[in-house]
Amino acid sequence: MAFLALGINHKTASVDVRERVAFTPEQLVDALQQLCRLTASREAAILSTCNRSELYIEQDHIAADAVLQWLADYHQLSLDELRASAYIHEEHDAVRHMMRVASGLDSLVLGEPQILGQMKSAYAVAREAGTVGPLLGRLFQATFSAAKQVRTDTAIGENPVSVAFAAVSLAKQIFSDLGRSQALLIGAGETITLVARHLHEQGVRRIVVANRTLERASILAEQFGAHAVLLADIPQELANSDIVISSTASQLPILGKGAVESALKQRRHKPIFMVDIAVPRDIEPQVGELDDVYLYTVDDLHEVVAENLKSRQGAAQAAEELVSAGADDFMVRLRELAAVDVLKAYRQQSERLRDEELQKALRLLGNGGNPEDVLMQLARGLTNKLLHAPSVQLKKLSAEGRLDALAMAQELFALHEGSTDKTPQ
């Protein structure tokens, strides 16, 4: 058994690369099954967010190159291009990395809680695809436990900070009084929900939620006294919007340069603040070329995030220690698990030998044999059979000069020098 964690994130790859390596929800099940089939991976899961795409894999033997090649082929990238941004963690490091990710220690926003939910979704999809078995399943459960402990035992989650919070903080820097501003939110997922909550708390005058389905938009809008519209209504709403924040799972841009130019004319070139949190991007990069548009992507939020994270830095060290301890504990339990199959096979073999000798003894008793003699024969026969295979192997090891193996056998059988009693002849 061997664990592998491989991927790219906001620290190793630009948004251009990240959006090319991202998986859509519709792709995941097929991608997982293909990954296992083509890379000799027994178990696999994929985590794909705006800031990272990672593969978590269990194999007989580490085959990172094959997995990296598959990822490049799947997204039609050159291997060299992908390798330049990719990182690979194996065994204990892979376990620790998963736990750090789920705990928010590897996030753009230190300690952000959304990543744990995304990790749980990755696990659920892998179960749906049939690519999670007992080993990777145990690792996910240990990862969730470690992340929960980090949340419970440290202050990493205090002073709520997220990409959504960073986007709203940036809006406050541009519009000193958000109470006079109108906001258009595109999407209705977890990130946009957080954005809506922060904007509502800041007293934004009007919030509009645009989504592919009106039902989903309405559910979110009702929570914050907002208005719900369809994506097709965005051009009409854009002209009235001072703040536009977008985060959808669309594979194609939702806002183009032409639509924004038209809105600016209607606004008489009153500035629009835009944040594109999506990967792939929802807003065409060319929109940023317009004079009256302030367009930011997730990569532009680093400075804002850094300013709001100082209060969490002290808790990070304690969280790292908890994660390291969790990874160590998991690896110990995993090594213990490796002995289970051996013990199970040994017990089955011993029980088979016992049953054979017991049946022989019962036949002798049925034929009128002396009970004491039969019991002695049963004990002697069972002892000889149980010791036969170990005796043969120990003699072989001795003949080969395998003193280390002999010492291990002595420890295995709890034998100590001089402890053997001499049996009377």
From Swiss-Prot:
Active-site annotation: 50
Pfam family, any one: GlutR_N
Alphabetized GO MF terms: glutamyl-tRNA reductase activity; NADP binding
Binding site for substrate: 49-52, 107, 112-114, 118
GO biological process entries: protoporphyrinogen IX biosynthetic process from glutamate
Keyword terms, alphabetized: NADP, Oxidoreductase, Porphyrin biosynthesis
Site (Important for activity): 97
Catalytic activity field: (S)-4-amino-5-oxopentanoate + tRNA(Glu) + NADP(+) = L-glutamyl-tRNA(Glu) + NADPH + H(+)
Keyword Oxidoreductase set for record: yes
Family: Belongs to the glutamyl-tRNA reductase family.
Subunit structure: Homodimer.
UniProt protein name: Glutamyl-tRNA reductase
